Amino acid sequence: MLLVIDVGNSNIVLGICDGTQLVRNWRISTDKSRTSDEYGVLLHSLFASAGLGFDTVDAAIISSVVPPLTGVMEAICRDFFHLTPFVVGPGIKTGMPILYDNPREVGADRIVNAVAGYEKHKCSLVIVDFGTATTFDYVNARGEYCGGAIAPGLAISLEALFQRASKLPRVDIARPPQIIARNTVNSMQAGIFYGYVGLVDEIVNRIVAESKDTPRVIATGGLAKLIAPESRTIVEVDDFLTLDGLKILYERNR
């Protein structure tokens, strides 16, 4: 089976693929202070809870936007699974032209999402990935990655408000009961939540206008299901887009 690993700034998402099927997946917190041994022990516990052994994995692929942890994940694959993983980066076969000024600058997760989105839909796309940063990526109808936009993530925005405004409390990310809120917590949630919905729709609409296209807009990432129902532009949420993209890239490079 194939182990797919997506290392983000806030979370590490792992999956086990058996053929074309994603059979198990886990989400753990990103911690740059953890060693490969510590992550290995954690993975052993996750595998055991799923009734799996490390010997069921015979291949692995890694996407990482956290350079200090890329080597840690490679070490886990070598030391615990006894294999050399593929790492998404320069030189890997994507099957997708990257129309970026410097293709090496594009985050691995953005390329993985673009590859998966186009492979699944075979049409022009805007992919919105809600992570520590929220990324907007445009793929044209020819399957070319054209670039996009990066915005501060929802959690970062909320944390900045708490840190910089002395009298405002730290609040959870949530859809408030109404936009005209009657207490401070709901007022903050209303401003952040609906402000962010507006940010998403405005950026998508500008991408659509600039591209002179009618792309399908899909969302992924931890907060996609929270934002998408209020968005006027997002038509689909794909929770496993990145893991599916890693599986596709593995098949193209094996």
UniProtKB/Swiss-Prot annotation:
Keywords per UniProt: ATP-binding, Coenzyme A biosynthesis, Cytoplasm, Kinase, Metal-binding, Nucleotide-binding, Potassium, Transferase
UniProt key word Cytoplasm: yes
Matches recorded under CDD domains: ASKHA_NBD_PanK-III
Any one cellular-component term (Gene Ontology): cytoplasm
Cofactor binding, note field: A monovalent cation. Ammonium or potassium.
One BP term from GO: coenzyme A biosynthetic process
Binding site for ATP: D6, V7, G8, N9, S10, N11, I12, V13, T132
Pathway(s): Cofactor biosynthesis; coenzyme A biosynthesis; CoA from (R)-pantothenate: step 1/5
Compartment(s): Cytoplasm
Reactions catalysed: (R)-pantothenate + ATP = (R)-4'-phosphopantothenate + ADP + H(+)
UniProt xrefs under Pfam families: Pan_kinase
Residues where substrate binds: Y100, G107, A108, D109, R110, T184
Domain of life: Bacteria
Positions that bind K(+): D129
This enzyme's EC code(s): 2.7.1.33
GO molecular function, one term: pantothenate kinase activity
Cofactors required: NH4(+); K(+)
Subunit: Homodimer.
Family per similarity comment: Belongs to the type III pantothenate kinase family.
Listed name of the protein: Type III pantothenate kinase
UniProt gene name: coaX
